[in-house]
UniProtKB/Swiss-Prot annotation:
GO terms for cellular component: cytoplasmic side of plasma membrane. It comes from the Bacteria. GO terms for biological process: glutamate biosynthetic process; proline catabolic process to glutamate. GO terms for molecular function: 1-pyrroline-5-carboxylate dehydrogenase activity. It comes from Bacillus pumilus (strain SAFR-032). This is 1-pyrroline-5-carboxylate dehydrogenase. Pathway: Amino-acid degradation; L-proline degradation into L-glutamate; L-glutamate from L-proline: step 2/2.
Length: 515
């Protein structure tokens, strides 16, 4: 009998012993940098001429690893391997499938700091963000394995005299997993494990910016006893390999986390029935957000300022849940802005080699250029409060940047920037605050800072987001506690880490037997 699920605790880096342990892990990981990682198709290692080089965004001359790059030929091999493995894996008992995932979780937990240290190197994550990413990866494994054991029981339906009816779940087939680079361990692991534990097989195309952690995770699954072909590792370009895999007639399910642009493209392509295709493809998508922290007129200023700061600048604002918009009542507007400015200017932006660094780099040159362009837009649309500076000499560093006095329809208030840029907008009433909070095409997360119970109840009904928080930041969803997924153009509201998520990877089957 399994123990009840409880989320993996975060590491307290104020404790000297924890800091030393993490420093040792960083040293150990640094010694392994520069290794090469082949494709994995049907358990076979395949090296290709074309390669993807993963670099440390905090230190551009440091190569984290080199990964073989798949083309259409390798993508085809991966799909065929997954399709073949599906014919046996689908009949493997839920208990056996879950046991593989439990073993992988236990192994990762034993090497938790090493995995987190790799995230520091490959994505430039500060220690606490890397630690939370690894903890969430473990949580996904532990939670989904338990959920599968429950789902295996089926759901009760009525039976009549002389008739026995069952309602059970069966897997769908080959699943294409396209995870993002920002939660390079947690989301990659969660979206890979969910189809596996439900009896599907996987073709994993990791983010090109962060493929090394995915290669390591595939190794971990193999060591836990996952059979050949159940997961196939094929890094490659979205335009070539991604489109090919989305279009493939044997692809049954696509799970994607990334931009609105790519997500809608996947939806469009997946809807077209290809020659030889015998099913309608499902798409599970999370496509970003433009998330708002609303501050009511009776709010605690210190609480509001800290919630806004944390929401906006955790992991350099590179979260789909990042609170990049602060909508503040005019009575507290100036006070809140000033306090956010004070907090922001005490934080360190640097290579996250110590626990004292609050913010590291952005992920790559393209992101750096995009974000700095938005900062220039912000200077035209609003008032620069603090930040606005950047340096890509050694790494891709942008200081946390705050703009005030933005119009609700301005670009900084409407477009997902995915960087450390925060926009403030002033409102004169709670009605207006809700109107502004809902005025984007996204609906992922949001927060309301208020002591007004009537306003809380109104926001529960009228603030149209998938994850709504009160009197706290709008980031940091925990598996099993805050199932995650959004409305509108934020995606399919699939609620990762929730009780309904695994069923999206399966088909319900009704069985009726007469006696």
């Amino acid at each position: 009998m399994t123990t009840p699920y409880k989320h993996e605790p975060f590491t307290d880096f104020s404790q000297e012993e924890n800091r030393k342990a993490f420093e040792q892990a960083l040293g150990k990981v640094t010694e392994t940098l520069g290794q090469t990682y082949p494709l994995v198709i049907n358990g076979e290692r395949i090296e290709t001429k074309d390669q993807i080089v993963s670099i440390n965004p905090a230190k551009k001359d440091e190569v984290v690893g080199t990964v073989s790059k798949a083309g259409k030929e390798e993508a085809e091999q991966a799909v065929q391997a997954a399709a073949k493995a599906f014919e046996t894996w689908r009949y493997t008992s839920p208990e056996e499938r879950a046991s593989v995932i439990f073993r992988a979780a236990a192994n990762i937990r034993r090497k938790k700091h090493e995995y987190s240290a790799l995230l520091v190197k490959e994505a430039g994550k500060p220690w606490n963000e890397a630690d939370a990413d690894t903890a969430e990866a473990i949580d996904f494994l532990e939670y989904y394995a338990r959920q599968m054991l429950e789902l295996a029981k089926g759901k009760p339906v009525n039976s009549r005299e002389g008739e026995h009816n069952q309602y059970v779940y069966t897997p769908t087939g080959v699943t294409l997993v396209i995870p993002p680079w920002n939660f390079l361990f947690a989301i990659m692991a969660g979206t890979t494990v969910a189809p596996i534990v439900t009896g599907n097989t996987v073709v994993l195309k990791p983010a090109s910016a962060t493929p090394v952690i995915a290669a390591r995770f595939v190794e971990e699954l193999e060591q836990a006893g996952l059979p050949k072909g159940v997961v196939n590792f094929v890094p490659g370009s979205g335009a070539e390999v991604g489109d090919y895999l989305v279009d493939h007639p044997k692809t049954s399910l696509i799970t994607f986390t990334g931009s609105r642009e790519v997500g809608t493209r996947i939806f469009e392509r997946a809807a077209k029935v290809q020659p030889g295709q015998q099913h309608l493809k499902r798409v599970i998508a999370e496509m970003g957000g433009k998330d708002t922290v609303v501050v009511d007129e009776d709010a605690d200023v210190e609480l509001a300022a800290n919630a806004i700061f944390t929401s906006a600048f955790g992991f350099s604002g590179q979260k789909c849940s990042a609170g990049s918009r602060a909508v503040v009542h005019e009575k507290l507007y100036d006070q809140v802005i000033e306090r956010v400015k004070e907090i922001t200017e005490t934080k360190t932006t640097a290579n996250p080699l110590s626990a004292d660094v609050y913010m590291g780099p952005v992920i790559d040159q393209a992101s750096f250029d995009k974000i700095t362009d938005y900062i220039e837009v912000g200077k035209q649309e609003g008032r620069l409060v603090t930040g606005g500076t950047s340096d890509d000499t050694e790494g891709y560093f942008i200081h946390p940047t705050v703009f005030a006095d933005l119009e609700p329809t301005s670009r900084l208030m409407q477009e997902e920037i995915f960087g450390p840029v925060l926009a403030f907008s002033k409102v004169s009433s709670f009605d207006e605050a809700l109107e502004v909070a809902n005025n984007t095409e996204y609906g992922l997360t949001g927060a309301v800072i208020t002591n007004n119970r009537d306003h809380i109840n109104r926001a529960k009904q009228e603030f149209h987001v998938g994850n709504l928080y009160f009197n706290r930041n709008c980031t940091g969803a925990i598996v099993g506690y805050h199932p995650f997924g959004g409305f509108k153009m934020s995606g399919t509201d699939s609620k990762a880490g929730g009780p309904d998520y695994l069923a999206l990877h399966m088909q319900a089957k009704t069985i009726s037997e007469m006696f």
